[in-house]
Amino acid sequence: MSEGKLFYVIGPSGSGKDSLMRYGRERLAGDPGVVFAHRYITRPVELHGENHVALTEDEFDARLATGLFALHWDSHGLRYGIGREINLWLAKGCNVVLNGSREYLPEARRRYPGLTAILVNVSPEVLAERLRARGRETEDQISRRVARAKQFMHPEGRLEVIANDAELHVAGERLVQLLSDADASKRAFA
C-alpha cells in the first residue's frame, strides 16, 4: 500500500478556505481515500464557521505537552493544532486535507516534504467584502489583513492555486478534481 498525500490548504482569512473545504468534504464524503483533518483551536465553535475542535489554553497546553499534535502554530492571538492521527491516515494510504497557515508552511514542508500546498486566492476587493460580512474584524484589522494577503509570496515547492472569487462550486470542483486526481494516481501506482 502506498502512503497517502498531504494537502495543506492556505490562504488569507476570508478567502473562503472553510467553505471550500466544506464543499470538498461533502462532495467526497463517500471516498474512503480522502480524509479532511479537523483543527484544534483555542477559539469557540461558531455556527457558520470552521468545523473545528475548540480547546481552552490549558487543554491545548496538555495536548502539546503529551505530543498529540503533528503540527501546531500560533496566529492572530489563537493557537492551532493538527492531531497526530494524520500520520496514521497517511500511513494507511489516505490523502489528508488540512487547513494550514501560510506562515507555518516552511515548517510543515520540513515535517512532510511531499505535501502539496493549495493556495486559495481572492481579489483584495472580494477579501475585504467577505471580512466585513463576517463581522469579526474592525476596519483597521480588515485593511491590515488585505495588505498582508497582497504581500504573501508564493512559497517554494509544489503549489496549486485555486481562485475563489466566483461561485463556490467553481473553486470547489477545482479542489475536488485535485484531490480526485491524486487519489487516482495513487491507486494506479499501488
Curated annotation (Swiss-Prot):
An MF annotation (GO) of this entry: ATP binding
Biological processes annotated in GO: 5-phosphoribose 1-diphosphate biosynthetic process; organic phosphonate metabolic process
EC number: 2.7.4.23
Catalytic activity: alpha-D-ribose 1,5-bisphosphate + ATP = 5-phospho-alpha-D-ribose 1-diphosphate + ADP
Gene3D superfamilies recorded: P-loop containing nucleotide triphosphate hydrolases
Chain sites annotated for binding ATP: G11, P12, S13, G14, S15, G16, K17, D18
Top class in the EC scheme: transferase
UniProt xrefs under PROSITE patterns: GUANYLATE_KINASE_2
Pathway assigned in UniProt: Metabolic intermediate biosynthesis; 5-phospho-alpha-D-ribose 1-diphosphate biosynthesis; 5-phospho-alpha-D-ribose 1-diphosphate from D-ribose 5-phosphate (route II): step 3/3
Gene Ontology annotations for the cellular component aspect, listed alphabetically: cytosol
Keyword annotations of the record: ATP-binding, Nucleotide-binding, Transferase
Domain of life: Bacteria
HAMAP family in UniProt: PhnN
Family (UniProt): Belongs to the ribose 1,5-bisphosphokinase family.
Purpose: Catalyzes the phosphorylation of ribose 1,5-bisphosphate to 5-phospho-D-ribosyl alpha-1-diphosphate (PRPP).
Name of the featured protein: Ribose 1,5-bisphosphate phosphokinase PhnN
Organism annotation: Thiobacillus denitrificans (strain ATCC 25259 / T1)
